Every structure is written in C-alpha cells, then in structure tokens.
Amino acid sequence: MNSHVYIIAEAGVNHNGDLDRAKQMIDVAADAGADAIKFQTFRAEYVVSRNAPKAEYQIRTTDRTESQFDMIRKLELTETHHEVLIAHAKMRGITFLSTPFDEHSLHLLTTRFGLQTIKIPSGEITNAPFLLNIARAAQRVILSTGMCTLAEVEAALSVLAFGFTTPTTAIPQREKFEQSFISEAGQRALRDRVTLLHCTTEYPAPFDEVNLRAMDTLAVAFGLPVGYSDHTPGIHISLAAVARGAQVIEKHFTLDNNLPGPDHKASIEPDELRALVRQSREIGQAMGDGIKRPTASEWKNRNIARKSLVAAKIIQAGEIFTQENLICKRPGNGNSPFNYWDLIGESAVIKYESDQLILLEQNKKRTYSNE
C-alpha cells in the first residue's frame, strides 16, 4: 500500500504578479518538502467579461471599486514568467503544475512547456469543450469537484473519457460521452489518468460545509483516486483528510497573510506548510496496510509485557495446582495463562519455588504457548 500523500502547495495568484515573489514561493514549497508547486495560468481577456462581478470573498479582500477583470489582470503570469518559474522549480527539484483557465493557457502549458498533468479547477467542471481539449492535450488530470453534484462529476468524467479514448476527429455528442464513460476503455483511461479532489469552493471554507465523507462517496461512485483541495483555515482539516485516505492534498499558501490580494487571508504561511507536509507524511506512514499483526518493534516487547503461569508460593512435587498456588505474572515467555484451567487439579511434576515459571511439560494438552 502506497503511504505517500502527494502534496500540492498551491501558490495560485498569491505571487501578486511579482516574479521574484513567485520564485520565493517555489523555494518555500521545495524547502517544506511538498511534491508540487501549483500556479494559475490565464489571460484575463479570455476568462472574465469586463462586467463580471467579484465573489464576496474577493470584495472583502481587494479594492471594492475594482472589477473582477481588472483584479485578475494584475495577477497574470506572462509566458516569460512561466519559463523562468518552470526552470526554477526544476532546479529546486519540485514539480511545476498550473491550472489553465482558457484555451490559450492550456496550449501554452501543454504544447509550449510540455506539462503532462493538468489541474482542472472546480469552476471549469461544466465547461465541456474545455474539458475535451484538456483530455486530448494532457496525460494526467486532477479534477476539483467544488460546487458539484455527483451527476455533474459524472458528466465531466464522461467528457474526459471520450477525449481520452477517441481520435481528435471524433464528433462530440452527449450520447457518445456517456458511451465512453461506461466503456471498458473509458473506465480504464479514467482509472489510469484521473484523480478527483473533493473541495468546498469558499474562501475560507466553513468547517461545517467541508463534508470530508464526500471523499468516500466519490471513491465508491467512480473508483478513482481521491484527494482533497482544502480552503479551510489551518492545516487540521487537511490532516483529517489524509487520515481518511486522501491520496492528494492541495493547500493554498502565501508568504504573508497580510499581503493584499484575494486569496492571502485563506492561505497558510510557510511554517504551517512545513508542518502540513511533515505531519501528512507521518500520518501516511501510520495508516499501514490494515493487517492486524504484531509489528517488528512489538515482538521484542511481547515477553516483557505479557504474563505466564507462575507459582504463587512454594509448590511441592506431587502437590495439586489450585487457584491459591497459581498466579499470572510477567515475563511472558513461559506457560500461557490460557492453560490455567487445564492445570487446576493436576499434580506438580517438580517442586516449584515462589515466582518460578510453571513448566510447559505440566500441560496434558499443551494447547497454548506464549511463544
């Protein structure tokens, strides 16, 4: 059983459009031991109409008079920025990931820079044309499921299955999506190439709306690897997700919660990121394989902690064993206490001093041994 939890340190737009800050975030994620650093790739003109309203959390954390278009345009990373950041991540030994929000950005990531894994954000899960192009461009997909019903997740997976298993000349149709989803080839492609992330799309996410049990629902419904994209304060909900079996954890982080920008307040700082990685690794190791058996370190303690049958007082050879002259005491390398009732009423074959281990040879049946 693989105990390694894949941790994505989500830089998102917390670089505020500053290349040096973005590079520093890569350093922080690498030093923390995260598996990947993830950014967001977009062109404002392709993503947001100029009259699109801000989300409530964006209004709370940014200039109220500024449009959503103007807000995100300041957070764009250029093609040159991407080139520098990908090289820096490679130098630091951490995987570079990014979420594309438009076709231009998808092409940039997969064709220009050769990214094999694409993260699909919750907001794009009903964007069927985009999903299809992602399936045809990416080797692997991480799909966030915030704001989704189970039916919407299945619909998105159907589009991905179609894209994975048909030639680019195939004409997209809903019926064909569904056929691809239920086909053996489609299911195999989904299992091999897709990871689902449970998510609550609110910043920060209220604890009573997290619903970690939905990870189990996703796993049972679709038979795919499942993880958790965490927008709650702190790291404890991420750790709870790891304990519930999440194979991937995605968590927003920032260099400073007090920086201006839409996501800083809902992000953890570097010390918390380090703690998240360390404790996730420890929990992953602690999960084990589920087989109940003594561990390697426990074997040396068995005889120390367990008990054996011993003489409660001097017992003469030929004397009858009774409840008064038998007792169970440590160490546990002698006659098992499970043989207690078999010995009662039997005669001692030798003389026993007080606290002396009762010989296994006393047992007529010798059914149980402590070894």
Go through each PLM region and give its residues.
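Catalytic cores and adjacent flexible loops of soluble metabolic enzymes
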Residues: 1-371
